[in-house]
Amino acid sequence: MNKLEEIDEPAGDDEISHPFDTLTPSFLIDAVESLGFYCDGRLFPLNSYENRVYQVGIEDATPMIAKFYRPQRWSEAQIREEHEFCFELVEQELPVVPPWRNEAGESLFMFGDFFFALFERRGGHAPELDDLDNLFTLGRLMGRIHAVGAVKAFQHRPAITIEDYGYASVALIGEQFIPTSLKDSYLSLTADLLQAVEAQFAQVSDLTLIRSHGDCHGGNILWRDDTANFVDFDDARMAPAVQDLWMLLCGDRPQQTAQLSEVVEGYNEFFTFHPKELRLIEPLRTLRMLHYAAWLARRWT
């Protein structure tokens, strides 16, 4: 039986057509003030495709960043694992922006139907990823992050797998979002792609999965004063180490080769990169594109 036929249709967001409709300004302010802050009424929405994130003005203090998690995407245990990973990284003096904790040490809160968290506001801009010195610095930092990530595994958060990112994504798109005239071509092409992806993964023996950022592109890195602040661990999963490296590369093949050399040189100062994972860059890129298409489909409403 074809693997695409074995996978049940993933659950969509039909039950919650617009999960964020209730996030009115008064709701947002009430949520933040429930934690003991006094808001000054200033609210500024920030870019976030999956959750809802706002800069919230605080009386006589620096604004805070409030993140409201999309209902039914992550469980409470999964979100707490994300937070705990950030706290572990901060304990090792890594430049990560962790959730704010109250006096009881709590970082995840509930208001209405939403889990939410607060974060300290950090300034910065996307790093220049064509600058080799920047890439060396990012490689060193990522090596340190992965040294912490490899200490233990996530118990609740999933892994990046061919089944989840590949076959499940194709099943959703093929069943609901492709015109009939294109369906056969789409399924044929994606079947060939996934066969090639599986072949590449099969050639990497003893592949180790570690806790990773999962979505480490320039938009999730705030660059300031010649260093980086890593933000948004919302997509943290178990994954090969190279998952957090390949999205730092840009340009043509010679440029990416030079960039990768800098990243890996810095990385190896703190954690060993296994060259066998290099053959997974294109398979992981393919899985990301398939997964992204399905992610857009699930958010269609």
What are these regions (language model features)?
Residues 71, 114-129, 170-178, 292-301:
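A glycine-centered beta->alpha junction motif in the catalytic cores
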Residues 128-185, 209:
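A cross-family kinase active-site recognition segment
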Residues 71, 124, 228, 236-238, ...:
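Activation segment
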Residues 1-103, 225-227:
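Conserved NTP-binding catalytic cores of kinases and kinase-like/nucleotidyltransferase enzymes
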Residues 1-9, 19, 158-202:
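Active-site catalytic-loop/activation-segment of kinase and kinase-like phosphoryl-transfer enzymes
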Residues 58-154:
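ATP-binding pocket architecture of kinase catalytic cores
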Residues 241-272, 288-301:
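Active-site activation/catalytic loop segments of kinase-like enzymes and analogous catalytic loops
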Residues 50-66, 99, 198-245:
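Active-site acidic catalytic loop and adjacent metal/ATP-binding pocket
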